[in-house]
Regions:
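Divalent metal-binding segments
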Residues: 59-68, 87-99, 119-131, 146-157, ...
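Gly-rich Lys/Arg/Thr-decorated short loops/hinges at beta-loop-alpha junctions or inter-strand turns
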Residues: 55-58, 83-88, 115-117, 189-198
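Histidine-rich, glycine-flanked metal-binding segment
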Residues: 5-52
Length: 340
């Protein structure tokens, strides 16, 4: 493979160069390798060469919503985007809140060519009221816990869940959108929402829960993942609490550091998602968070819907999109390997 941009996690380097492969093994990486006449040459000019990517935030819609996607088609989409390991969220139907559902998913996942991990839900039926049997679910193969798609509104319940996760030494991941602030979710409250004639979701809906959960993380000692950050102020909060010793892991999506809410004016419902695309200032703050390590995870939050669902009016359609392909199409000048 010649003329590629080679990302090497083992050496934490990015170089332009060539890779020699023999018998399915990498033999040599160098700035330039002269091939023999018998060797196949792949020109990787303008392409990134990297190990298989890990996407820690995926919705394969299986079980329950397989008209949108299932484990097999989702796995194909992941591989096409260069992703070879995924973590699936628990908001399926039935919810991954018990061992039989978890075991069914993990068993079917073995047939796929990528590696699939499954998170279990924090609460039964994603209601935020009763903890699942986290110990049993971990022993059955759950890699972590999340009610992603729905926030944990009760602070005491959230703290209890963090304490349990800490005792089991597993991460707990949180969707941070307080519905009390929101009308017409999926659209940032601001100049664009005013043009569209809707109220939308102000950034305080995210920031208020991020502030709360950063403190709960600090006090509980749990490994807490703040999912799909969309607000610059959220980045500031996480930076501050990390400095105080909170075991926080912050996640950003490609769409939140490459697009703004202006995309709604051009793309309509295709640019509607939870949390919403926000302002240019928020986008730049997320990039700064990636640069300085405040944000330490890039994940797609791949969440496909059917074409019929996305074709509904702006205030009715489902929020979400197929995002695994975004990993192949981040605009030049904005990709993490160029800026971080």
């Amino acid at each position: 493979i010649k003329n590629g941009t080679i990302m090497n996690p083992a050496t934490q380097t990015i170089i332009s160069g060539d890779i020699l492969i023999e018998d399915d093994k990498i033999i040599k990486i160098a700035a330039s390798i002269t091939p023999s006449e018998s060797e196949e040459v792949i020109d990787a000019s303008g392409l990134v060469i990297a190990p298989g990517l890990i996407d820690t935030h995926i919705h394969f819609r299986d079980p329950g919503f397989t008209y949108k996607e299932d484990i097999h088609t989702g796995s194909l989409s992941a591989a096409h985007g260069g992703v070879t390991t995924v973590i699936c969220m628990a908001n399926t139907s039935p919810t991954v809140d018990n061992v039989p559902v978890l075991e069914d998913i993990l068993q079917r996942a073995k047939a796929e060519d990528i590696r699939i991990y499954q998170a279990a839900s924090i609460s039964h039926s994603l209601k935020g009221e009763t903890l699942t049997d986290m110990k049993a679910l971990k022993e059955a193969g759950a890699c972590g816990f999340t009610d992603d798609g729905i926030p944990l509104k009760n602070a005491a319940f959230c703290y209890k869940a963090m304490e349990e996760a800490a005792s089991l030494n597993v991460p707990i991941s949180l969707h941070e959108e307080d519905p009390a602030f929101i009308t017409n979710n999926g659209i940032n409250h601001g100049d664009v929402s005013e043009k569209l004639g809707v109220y939308g979701s102000p950034s305080i809906a995210e920031e208020s829960l991020v502030a709360r959960d950063c403190m709960l993380a600090l006090r509980s000692g749990a490994d807490v993942v703040i999912q799909h950050i969309s607000s610059g102020r959220s980045v500031e909060l996480i930076r501050m609490f990390k400095a105080q010793g909170a075991k926080l892991h912050a996640e950003a999506t490609p769409h939140h550091f490459t697009l703004t809410d202006e995309a709604l004016l051009e793309h309509g419902t295709l640019a509607k998602m939870n949390p919403p695309l926000r302002t240019e200032a928020d986008r730049l703050a997320i990039i700064e968070g990636l640069k300085d390590g405040t944000i330490d995870l890039i994940a797609t939050d791949h969440a496909p819907h059917s074409a019929e669902e996305k074709a509904k009016p702006l205030t009715e359609e489902k929020r979400g999109s197929d995002r695994l392909f975004l990993l192949r199409s981040v605009p030049a000048g904005l990709s993490p390997h160029e800026q971080v």
